[in-house]
A protein has these predicted regions:
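Noncatalytic scaffold domains of N-terminal-nucleophile
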Residues: 1-35, 39, 47-224, 229-291, ...
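Internal maturation/activation junctions in enzymes
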Residues: 3-6, 218, 235, 239, ...
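Long, structured ligand/cofactor-binding scaffold of large enzymes
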Residues: 39-41, 378-379
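Short amphipathic alpha-helical interaction patches enriched in hydrophobic/aromatic residues
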Residues: 41, 211, 307-310
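Flexible, polar/acidic helix-loop-strand segments at domain edges
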Residues: 294
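Protein kinase glycine-rich loop
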Residues: 298
Length: 383
């Protein structure tokens, strides 16, 4: 590389230096998590070890965006395997979450908040699977930084503080266990103040301890950590809370949960092939329909029928076409997507040129305000 000439951009004009190097790069949405990821590389970990350590710290420092109760679709490429892969980290709904059960509760839709909305939390098992099959480290190596920041605290970011403020009354009046964590001293933590989550630190510390007590190699310890999460004290606590507690949700009424320890024990994260779409000289990879990610692939299939190269990328025509194609793809999501373990999703048809050529005919120079799914024989399409 010539001195002063960037390999990324040969004619750079930036107010910040471009990130280049020969050792490794870590990026995340929080500087502490990024630093932990880089430290993991410097300790000899590989990219997957760094990703796992970074992810666990993000749960601590950005609790308004993710946490141990969440899900995670992972798209990865391991040079040793030579192909992109997906880890499904989307836990299923509880076995008891049937239409009959919600009808019995007087509900015609699953509440968007509260215990009834809870699925099997897929995050922990997913990161452990990634660590086992692609990483090199033990659970203690990737969890220790998160435990430290959860126990000792970190400067809470403005958006986390603001998000807690929006649910302050709800936590104070109806979610006392959440209030105990997120309203220290009974108040919303101001931006920049030191914020700790010692309950989370205790949880991960116990998992690390029980995994280490299992002895053996790293794989045995990882498997023990997964078991502790899905069949041990974590699953037991979730089961007990959902059975014994009722908390108010978006319906305005208190409800208990349907998630059980048996639901937790039945599910594990798994590796699968991505769904792909060839667009120009690129192959775009997304997780399966369970992630809703293939909506983007259908948007590309719709856009393929237009000469975008000749358009201003910030001009009204370019933006209009992108928005209208997105509307059609999302309408098809509403009509055809579902859990592939229970629903046959016609994804090959939804990504086909024949189908999308017909869908493009709906796009005019006028913005549509209607939800317009397609119609496929044997699959309905009505919403």
């Amino acid at each position: 590389m010539r001195a002063g000439v960037s390999r990324i951009n040969p004619n750079p004009f930036t107010t910040r230096p471009e990130i280049e190097g020969t050792f490794g790069v870590v990026t995340s949405t929080h500087w502490i998590a990024t630093a932990v990821g880089m430290a993991t590389l410097e300790k000899g970990g590989n990219a997957f070890d760094a990703a796992v350590a970074t992810a666990f710290v993000l749960q601590v420092v950005e609790p308004h965006l993710n946490g141990p109760g969440g899900d995670v679709p992972v798209i990865l490429h391991d040079v040793k395997r030579g192909k992109p892969e997906v880890i499904c980290g989307q836990g299923p709904a509880p076995a008891a979450a049937t239409i009959a059960r919600f009808t019995e509760l007087g509900l015609d839709i699953v509440p968007g908040t509260g215990l009834l909305a809870a699925c099997v939390p897929g995050m922990f098992d997913t990161w452990m699977l990634l660590l086992r099959d692609y990483g090199t480290m033990r659970p203690s190596d990737v969890l220790t930084p998160a435990i430290s920041y959860a126990r000792n605290g970190h400067p809470i970011v403005e958006r986390a503080s603001a998000t807690i403020a929006t649910v302050e009354e709800l936590f104070r009046d109806h979610w006392p266990t959440s209030a105990a964590v997120y309203l220290p001293d009974g108040n919303v933590p101001p931006p920049g103040s030191m914020f700790a989550n010692r309950t989370l630190a205790d949880t991960y510390e116990r998992i690390v301890r029980e995994a280490a007590n299992a002895g053996g190699d790293r794989v045995k310890q990882i498997e023990r950590a997964r078991q502790v999460w899905s069949q041990g004290f974590v699953a037991e606590a979730i089961d007990r809370f959902c059975r014994t507690q009722k908390v108010i949700d978006v319906t305005g009424a208190p409800h208990g949960g349907l998630l059980t320890g048996a639901d937790m024990a039945r599910w594990q994260a798994h590796v699968e092939a991505p769904l792909t779409y060839d667009y120009g000289r690129y192959t775009v990879c997304k997780a399966g329909v369970w992630s809703q990610g293939p909506v983007l692939l259908q948007q590309l299939a719709l856009l393929r029928g237009y000469d975008l190269d000749g358009m201003d990328p910030i001009g009204p025509q370019f933006i209009h076409l992108q928005v209208e194609c997105a509307k059609l793809a999302f309408a098809d999501r509403e009509a055809f997507y579902g859990d592939p373990d229970f629903v046959k999703v016609p994804i090959d048809t939804l990504l086909s040129e024949k189908y999308n050529a017909e869908r493009r005919k709906l796009i005019s120079n006028k913005a549509s305000m209607d939800l317009r799914p397609g119609s496929l024989t044997g699959f309905g399409g009505a919403i």
